[in-house]
């Protein structure tokens, strides 16, 4: 008999997309899945087979030209504040529907603090989702990069979190343990081989790799009829208002054999970039999985979801990182020989073009991509993720209590 499983997430597509294959697989197995989603994400969730629990978000929409990720110096503190504000705003909207129809298990994204708090408050077993490099247990982001623990955003976050938890009757949960919950299971949408210190993580961390599935509403796309090699260039859906970079792409690939598919997002008018070269195809949004099936190289900001989808398709990467998290992904891309990383400082059309040529022709990178792709395929994807979720439903309730990691 199927059980009721609830997903909490944030609206960012890089966090939403990795979960949809898991949703579809759980529904296929007879479970009833509910998923908190904003109006602009509801179609994806419904297509995967889940019941949508609607809410409004504090996070910027896809067309907001002012949307930016935090600067590196305040990345951690500002991000924590942003997602705490999201939890404060969203949990009161979602809780009535869940009180009327309680779930048997909660799955919550690392940054979906509302799911963490809801599960803890109501004593419901939970699974934490990682659409990013895992920062827990054997490896910590805070230890891997310099973090100014005196930055005012961190102090503000701690005070605000303490007030939020106290208001939910969780004043005994220390703020410094809030980000380290002991849950029934962790699901990470990457293979163990890509994770920093991957071998040191225990079996409670399921590195299942990407769980891709066709996406509702993807635009149509066809590969070039002349058989030209395809390079996909995309900066994702958040920090993508970067007209100077797109013009640099025009210059880098004009009069080259490459057919470039360039996603520029919904935050600018493509016409404002000027006329692209004939071999550069400009689109607000691209059907990424379809393009990757034909691509030879993927140039991106280094978001983990895109990196994993590229590896799954056997496509090497060129990362142009813009945030602290992306810096770490880019370094891992180089470490595992699945691509290259370019520094924003001094980026030129020639350097971009040369990097694309190198990752396309370097036998070492071809071998690295093949090896990591084998790891991705062995990780199990959505089927293994669903197996692990179901194992949480079978465990005794006491073994699944939400508590801080030791």
Regions found by a protein language model. Name each.
Residues 100, 167-171, 189, 193, ...:
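A structural signal for alpha-helix termini and helix-coil/disorder junctions
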Residues 5, 184-186, 259-260:
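Hydrophobic beta-strand segments of well-ordered beta-sheets in folded domains
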Residues 1-155, 159-162, 262-406:
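Glycosyltransferase specificity loop/lid
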Residues 98, 178-179, 223, 290:
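Structural motif
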Residues 195-297:
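Donor-nucleotide binding loops and adjacent catalytic segments primarily
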Residues 34-35, 109, 166-172, 186-192, ...:
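Short amphipathic alpha-helical surface micro-motifs
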Residues 156-204:
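A short, active-site helix/loop in glycosyltransferases that binds the activated sugar's phosphate group
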């Amino acid at each position: 008999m199927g059980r009721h499983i609830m997903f909490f997430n944030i609206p960012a597509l890089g966090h939403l997309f990795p979960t949809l294959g898991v949703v579809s697989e759980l529904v296929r197995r007879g479970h009833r899945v509910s998923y908190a989603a904003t109006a602009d994400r509801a179609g994806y969730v419904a297509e995967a087979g889940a019941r949508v629990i609607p809410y409004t978000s504090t996070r910027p929409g896809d067309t907001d030209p002012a949307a930016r990720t935090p600067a590196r110096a305040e990345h951690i503190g500002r991000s924590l504040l942003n997602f705490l504000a999201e939890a404060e705003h969203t949990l009161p909207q979602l809780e009535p529907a869940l009180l009327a129809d309680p779930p048997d298990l909660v799955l919550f994204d690392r940054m979906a603090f509302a799911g963490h708090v809801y599960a803890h408050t109501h004593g419901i077993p939970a699974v934490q989702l990682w659409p990013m490099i895992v920062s827990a247990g054997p490896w910590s982001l805070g230890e891997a990069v310099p973090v100014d623990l005196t930055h005012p955003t961190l102090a503000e976050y701690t005070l605000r979190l303490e007030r939020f938890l106290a208001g939910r009757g969780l004043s005994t949960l220390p703020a410094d343990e809030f980000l380290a919950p002991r849950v029934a299971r962790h699901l990470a949408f990457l293979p163990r081989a890509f994770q920093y210190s991957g071998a040191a993580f225990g079996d409670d961390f399921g590195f299942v790799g990407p769980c891709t599935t066709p996406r509702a509403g993807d635009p149509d796309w066809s590969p070039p009829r002349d058989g030209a090699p395809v390079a996909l260039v995309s900066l994702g859906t958040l920090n993508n208002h970067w007209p100077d970079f797109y013009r640099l792409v025009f210059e880098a690939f004009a009069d080259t054999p490459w057919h470039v598919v360039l996603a520029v997002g919904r935050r600018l008018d493509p016409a404002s970039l000027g006329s692209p070269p004939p071999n550069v195809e400009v689109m607000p949004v691209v059907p990424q999985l379809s393009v990757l099936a034909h691509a030879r190289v993927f140039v991106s900001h280094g978001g983990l979801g895109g990196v994993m989808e590229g590896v799954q398709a056997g496509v090497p990467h060129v990362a142009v990182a813009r945030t602290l998290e992306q810096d770490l992904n880019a370094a891992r891309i180089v470490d595992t020989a699945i691509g290259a990383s370019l520094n924003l400082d001094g980026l030129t059309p020639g350097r971009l073009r040369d990097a694309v040529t190198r990752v396309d022709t370097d036998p070492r990178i071809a071998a690295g991509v093949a090896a990591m792709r084998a790891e991705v395929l062995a990780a199990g994807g959505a089927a293994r993720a669903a197996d692990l979720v179901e194992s949480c439903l079978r465990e005794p309730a006491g073994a699944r209590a939400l508590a801080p990691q030791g």
